[in-house]
């Protein structure tokens, strides 16, 4: 814990500390996405043990990543939702679906001539969320251990679902804004607005 006066306190763990490999977060990766299985709610807690010759863990020392704004879909073609702006972020989705339904959400920066998701430019980055419903009815998913670079999101499921609410949480580096710009030229203003979305890189630049 770092305090405002520059001092700090270390709160260490002891033999009473326990951990678990269970829980709904089954997989998470910076480039490939996250798997959340809400059926996995039971946690088996086990005593921890110290591993030899491991690297020292330190807290992140750069600018924090924070929510900048939320985008709603501006269009939908097939099962592809268009958020109108290429950005770094993660979806928050509420669905009405049966228990055990597997929902797959792929993210991309482009669509093809038929309006379907185009992901060849992402190379090996999968940018995919796999969400498994833990009960019947309304449930919300909000991945917290990955982020995507995208404008379009393709949603599919192995059972019929209803998307109740869908929005994209735009993520950005927590940099202090020191000025603003506006003008009557639409193209120039759009260029300026796009700059605000460049504080976190998108998949091709990662």
For the regions a protein language model found, what residue spans apply to each?
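Extracellular/oxidizing-compartment recognition motifs
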Residues: 1-206
């Amino acid at each position: 814990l770092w305090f405002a006066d520059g001092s700090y306190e270390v709160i260490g763990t002891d033999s009473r500390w326990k951990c678990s490999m269970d829980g709904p977060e089954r997989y998470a990766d910076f480039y490939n996405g996250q798997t959340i299985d809400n059926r996995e709610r039971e946690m088996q807690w086990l005593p921890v043990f110290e591993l030899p010759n491991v690297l020292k863990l330190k807290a992140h020392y750069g600018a924090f990543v924070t929510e900048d704004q939320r985008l709603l879909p501006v269009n939908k073609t097939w099962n592809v939702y268009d958020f109108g702006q290429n950005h770094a972020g993660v979806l928050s989705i509420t669905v009405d679906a049966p228990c055990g339904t597997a929902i797959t959400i792929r993210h991309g920066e482009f669509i093809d001539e038929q309006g379907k998701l185009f992901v060849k430019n992402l190379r090996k980055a999968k940018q995919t969320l796999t969400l498994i419903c833990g009960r019947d009815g309304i449930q919300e998913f909000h991945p917290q251990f990955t982020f995507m670079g995208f404008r379009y999101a393709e949603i599919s499921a192995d059972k019929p679902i209803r998307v109740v609410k869908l929005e994209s949480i735009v993520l950005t580096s927590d940099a202090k804004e020191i000025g603003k710009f506006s003008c009557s030229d639409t193209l120039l203003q759009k260029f300026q607005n796009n700059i605000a979305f460049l504080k976190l890189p998108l998949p091709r630049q990662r």
